Amino acid sequence: MDISKLLKDRKILILIIFVTLSVFLIVFKGLDFGIDLSGGTIIVLKAEKPMSDKEIEATIKIITERLNYNGLNDVVIYPRGNDEIIVEIPKSCDTDRIIKILKQQGVFVAKIDNITAYTGSDVQNVELPTKIPQGETWAYGVPFELTLEGAKKFAEVAKGKAYHKVELYMDGKLISAPVLSPDLADGKPHPQQVITVGAYPPTKEEIDEAMAIYSALKSGALPVKLDIEYISTISPEFGKEFLKGTAIALLLAFIAVGIIVSIRYKQPKIAIPILITCISEVIIILGFASLIDWKLDLPSIAGIIAAVGTGVDNQIVITDEALKRGAGKIRASIKRAFFIIFASAATSIAAMLPLFVLGVGMLKGFAITTIAGVLIGIFITRPAFARIIEEMFKKF
């Protein structure tokens, strides 16, 4: 076998380029692991009643927005059934702060003398918490703007009630009660409003409270009330042990494949390209995961193993066809093998697509890595392997 000739082949060069890029991504960009491997907290939120598909979508969108507004964008959120929302929190995030945000339904009401002046649905613009002039001093709070309709409602309720308290409630809890100034009690619409949480400069607790109010007003109220059903903490030690066990299992699997292939074909050298192709496939899949910032979890690892298993099957099909037809018809035999491989790949992808499109959480992770592995196999690693086999058997 002419190795120097192989290294100049387009299919082999493509494989080498992808493996090199993948190694670069893995080393310098790193891999993200799900909480089942890196540790973290799982929170199960229970809805007070079954939710429709639109309510589930709106709930996840609102929770995601609230967390993003607070700089907590590494949290994974997905539904389970029609009455539960699962929240996965990495160990690097402030779990207590997230729990506080999750407890908010975000129902905002302003009352004067126990009469509703406006609600969260009347709020149209919300600004980030900032310092606000308050007489001769400064306060810290959340400025916001009412719609014209909301401002008119407030004007009607506030008219003639100077120095009465404007009680602001979030989820039934009083969060602020400023005194109504005379200029806001003149019966005219005043869209600009503010919720103060304390004096300026604020404490950390006041900053967190203001951000929670800001995110609740900005995202709107949840369509249904959610309660925390239970909280589960996952130790990172479990993930480390699993990854260690997976690495050992893959190593043993590669050794077993090498031995079985050597016995099956009575040619140990055939096992070498099969093993190199399998290892290359794993590296490219991991590089792809690093590129798209996909969090690798237990099902994702299972998907990688499944893809590698499929890869070994495909390589055996290519090898069998090449040996069966002989040197004179080796190209035709490999072409026939690829017909079988493409049909098998199409079946695998078709089986995974429903999980990818409709699946959430763990199911989606399995589908993504399996589909990625199959596509990487048929377009990158299998053609390279076939070229090696063609060169290896051309004299047979």
Curated annotation (Swiss-Prot):
Recorded superkingdom: Archaea
GO biological process: intracellular protein transmembrane transport; protein targeting; protein transport
InterPro entries for the chain: SecD/SecF_arch_bac, SecD/SecF_CS, SecD_1st, SecD_arc, SecD_SecF_C
Membrane-traversing stretches: 12-32, 243-263, 272-292, 298-318, 338-358, 360-380
Localisation: Cell membrane
Keywords attached to this entry: Cell membrane, Membrane, Protein transport, Translocation, Transmembrane, Transmembrane helix, Transport
Pfam family membership, one: SecD_SecF_C
Similarity-based family: Belongs to the SecD/SecF family. SecD subfamily.
Subunit relationships: Part of the protein translocation apparatus. Forms a complex with SecF.
Protein name: Protein-export membrane protein SecD
Gene assigned in the entry: secD
